[in-house]
């Protein structure tokens, strides 16, 4: 089983329906707040079930949800097919999109599932698809020194505030015996220092890489903003 197989099937990464709903609502609110303008074209890469994507769609001109798992794409189309400015695509379809067509690319809680030799071509694709001056946000990046205990503590705090604390306790126990735990042991999760991810993003051709507030409930994970070089203005004759 690969990470794509895991997300393509039934899993228990969320401890309850309420956990899932609150998680996706928080992420959607954070993405919507980052949208640069009402007419912006936004790509959400590795969006998962994106239960509150309508909040993002209402904040921008065009929202493109990219998801590698085909079963998740089917759910997204069934849920959001009525929204004229929202489309659902595969990673392969992103590669076929016109260059210089996006204002914002968001990859939240994604790059930990990519090896470095997978992340590098992804960065190149995102750079090509962004308009000059467009923004890339990498969120929920895991630093090498982040303890699983810290992640668990942040989840329990989110659960306490969100009203699913008992379910979260049970979910943490189930995770020990889950496919997620086995896959994490087999494949690991990619971690990056701030210096390391900055170097990778700059090497891909982005400029102005800076730390920003993370998306979601866990402030111990990192987020970064970077931009495609703006086209220089032609000199006035």
Model-derived features: where do they sit?
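Class I (Rossmann-like) S-adenosyl-L-methionine-dependent methyltransferase catalytic domain
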Residues: 1-35, 39, 49-85, 90-96, ...
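Structural signature of beta-strand start/N-cap positions in the alpha/beta core
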Residues: 41, 62, 101-103
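A conserved beta-strand element that flanks and buttresses the S-adenosyl-L-methionine
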Residues: 106
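Helix-capping/helix-break motifs at membrane-protein junctions
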Residues: 115-116
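A short glycine-rich, Lys/Arg-flanked "PGG" loop and its adjoining helix->strand segment in the class I
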Residues: 120-132
